[in-house]
């Protein structure tokens, strides 16, 4: 007598934060699809609850398995560092705080799906934000056969319904004291949106900030020296640091001076404009220092072209194309351009600003004897006349024609 084979139950890997929406999503997905849910929480320095507490909550909410990953160093080394080397500021202002964390999380979601034989990955994004694209474009780039679902978008899991579901199932998660804001944070920065900020005339209030102190409050300035090797921050005030430690220390020191506050209306990937408030003290301090060291060490034509590459790199990352061939190719160029970005940058952190006050580098292209206007100037000014004649020749020829 042959035994009947037990049908294989489909499995869904869920990007789990430990909050109400993703806790409810565990049971919601199970009811809507009949699948078993595996919860995966990834620590990218967002702070908050202990990872083991989050893991146990996922199991209590119905996950058949729950995994947590401490990815802080990975996030800093493999995602934040390339952004620093690229001086990445979307629309010249936003240091890609959320956009950088999504591919980190995606990598762990895909690994969990492959480990547990899941066919689908789920996330908690809405249908009008950038993150749904970042998650799903990243997932299919790493595992083209995986399907993606978003309960809020695909199954109309509104917050009211989520609260009712939570109370009905008696899930171990609070349903009160909901912030009026949508907040996303990691070690590279913090993003705040919605609530009264949706009226773009309303000024942000101090209560929304956590990573930065009020820059208007009087306090003594803080001087810091950041050392780089090939574009990588390797020391602060002469003490060796990892990339993660550099970000964390500058978050604390620059944040205490109110550095890194950004209030902007940005162009979202989905076609709308959105008002966002960011705090990124460590990111802004590092990018400011790195840019200045590049000014000292990178040849002019390379520096000019790199600025174009930086903008495109930032757009690709913002648009969820972290794993794209173009982004990888541009990163190769950026790494090459950073080969001689070595040295120290001295900065004063005060009043919401990170101001560079000193630069030194063994690979500097700054030649004092060529730059000085004092005695000892080695610049051959006699060569300037002939250079100008040749440089302006094409304009001179065109002017003769156009003004005739």
From Swiss-Prot:
Binding site for ATP: 15-23, 124
Main location: cytoplasm
Catalytic activity, EC: 6.3.4.5
Matching SUPFAM superfamilies: Adenine nucleotide alpha hydrolases-like, Argininosuccinate synthetase, C-terminal domain
Assigned keywords, A-Z: Amino-acid biosynthesis, Arginine biosynthesis, ATP-binding, Cytoplasm, Ligase, Nucleotide-binding
Positions bound to L-citrulline: 94, 130, 134, 182, 266, 278
Binding site for L-aspartate: 126, 130-131
A Pfam match: Arginosuc_synth
Keyword Nucleotide-binding tagged: yes
Catalytic activity: L-citrulline + L-aspartate + ATP = 2-(N(omega)-L-arginino)succinate + AMP + diphosphate + H(+)
GO biological process: argininosuccinate metabolic process; L-arginine biosynthetic process; urea cycle
InterPro entries to which the protein is assigned, alphabetical: Arginosuc_syn_C, Arginosuc_syn_N, Arginosuc_synth, Arginosuc_synth_CS, Arginosuc_synth_type_1_subfam, AS_cat/multimer_dom_body, Rossmann-like_a/b/a_fold
GO cellular component, as recorded: cytoplasm
A GO molecular function held by the record: ATP binding
Lineage top rank: taxon: Bacteria
Entry keyword annotation includes Ligase: yes
Pathways involved: Amino-acid biosynthesis; L-arginine biosynthesis; L-arginine from L-ornithine and carbamoyl phosphate: step 2/3
Locations listed in the record: Cytoplasm
Family recorded in the similarity comment: Belongs to the argininosuccinate synthase family. Type 1 subfamily.
Summary of subunit composition and partner proteins: Homotetramer.
Listed name of the protein: Argininosuccinate synthase
Organism: Streptomyces avermitilis (strain ATCC 31267 / DSM 46492 / JCM 5070 / NBRC 14893 / NCIMB 12804 / NRRL 8165 / MA-4680)
